[in-house]
């Protein structure tokens, strides 16, 4: 399994926004068929409503992600983006892993397929949440909710 610390159930998937990811996975032979299917399920679009109310969208994302079993020590932090190009949906626009270190937390992320992974050290989880919130705050548009952060299956509220 490509993500050893997350149990991914067999769910219906909507991988329509994952064409770039799946192309890179196929070209790089990154995953076998089973792992690619799990990837597509975890990062599926989630249906939502036409509202700018982040609470509404966060509740939908919490419900979706509650079907997965996450590791509490290696936390999946996700930036969730609202999209209305083909119906109202939510998708994980960026993801990284947060792990405790001796004097804080280490956040590991990959910004693009072409760039190497990067690791950033934070004193607190909240500092990492703020970093993500600030970095992705403009990934929105007119009539759309602002991006929000999920820590495993829980909405991070500031």
Residue ranges, per PLM feature:
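Low-complexity, Gly/Ser/Thr/Pro-rich intrinsically disordered linker/tail segments
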Residues: 107-110, 114-115, 123-158
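Acidic/His-rich structured neighborhood in mature extracellular/periplasmic domains
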Residues: 1-81, 92, 100, 104-105, ...
């Amino acid at each position: 399994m490509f993500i050893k610390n997350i149990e991914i159930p067999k769910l219906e998937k909507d991988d329509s926004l994952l064409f770039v990811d799946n192309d890179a996975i196929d070209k790089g032979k990154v995953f076998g068929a089973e792992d690619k299917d799990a990837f597509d399920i975890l990062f599926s679009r989630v249906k939502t409503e036409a509202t700018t109310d982040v609470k509404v969208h966060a509740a939908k994302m919490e419900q979706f992600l509650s079907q997965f079993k996450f590791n509490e020590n290696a936390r999946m932090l996700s930036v969730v983006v609202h999209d209305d190009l083909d119906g109202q949906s939510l998708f994980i626009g960026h993801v990284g892993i947060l792990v405790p270190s001796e004097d804080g937390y280490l956040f590991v992320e990959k910004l693009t397929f072409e760039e190497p992974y990067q690791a950033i050290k934070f004193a607190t989880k909240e500092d990492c949440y703020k970093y993500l919130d600030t970095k992705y705050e403009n990934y929105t548009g007119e009539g759309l909710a602002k991006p929000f952060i999920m820590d495993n299956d829980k909405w991070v509220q500031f």
